Amino acid sequence: MLSQRQLFLDHLGQTSDFPLMLEIERARGVYMYSAEGKRYLDLISGIGVSNVGHRHPKVLQAIQDQLDHYLHLMVYGELVQSPQVQLAEALAKTLPDPLNACFLVNSGSEAIEGALKLAKRYTERPNLVSCLNAYHGSSHGALSVSGSEQFKQGYRPLLPGVSHIRFNHPEDFTHINEQTAAVVVETVQGEAGVQVADDSYFQVLREHCDKVGALLILDEIQAGFGRTGTFWAFEPYGVVPDILVAAKGMGGGMPIGAFIASPEIMQVLKNNPILGHITTFGGHPVSAAASLATLHVIQEEKLLEQVSDKARLITERLQHPAIRGIRQRGLMMAVEFESFDILKPVIDRAIELGVLTDWFLYCDNAMRVAPPLTIQ
């Protein structure tokens, strides 16, 4: 009989020639357990997903409660489904006005696609601007606004009318003009290795977008839902985006995403044509119930208030001559080494010792540290 690992290689589409190949049987809290019974401390939260830990009891209960009522009923946007309505209302309460219209989808890439369409439809403009070294997803449009040619070159031609500027370089804003529908920016650049903007960057960007009439889309797929110590990473910057994108940590381990805007902007998807953006499974009631429970856990267990102390404790312990520095916002950290050749054995040894971490897509000399917010 073939092993699970061999069946994994034989029958599942692969993403690289070197998957981790850990066979995980169960998970709880900050730990995952292999089929052989080995325990792994999850320091990456499934790449920013398990913000409240694996299988949080309140998330599980919300899922079970929804299973007892219904699963999929109808394509998104037709029936009044309580999990969707309650989640959208709760999200609006975490956000400043006028961000109180929420379109639910299945993932971060889908949320980016919806946000790009919304911006083009609302402004009736053709062009988009994003940042070099940005990662917004793997679908066609999301890949187009991502900022690494290495990952795009095999799939061209991509969307026309997309240009890229440097992150945290306001002098590049001259590329944002009256033909720009939107500027899409990660509030914290994730796959570039946790690149954090200067305090004034987003304020200047907001002012420039207003000046030329371009929308500002902030991508908080990785940085949102408490990861940085505030519920939304943009809060300390004193700006409000026109469109906000969320996913990953939003679902407590279930697949869900959202793009959020003002009712004025969101309403353009309703007509000319009708059904301007549709999804069969977006906002699935089980995922929506899990997301609402996740939001409540973050608030009720006061996880935001704990992020700073936990981050400080981790950074205090990450002291070693091989570590060149640590970039961070809350529990979103990049531990920098001189090179990938030095970092890779560290990651391999950590996994051998039962600690799961990895490196970043565009920054392979930095170790990703982004544990569940529930870590003690």
Feature roles, as predicted:
Residues M1-Q376:
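Conserved N-terminal phosphate-binding loop of PLP-dependent enzymes in the Aspartate aminotransferase
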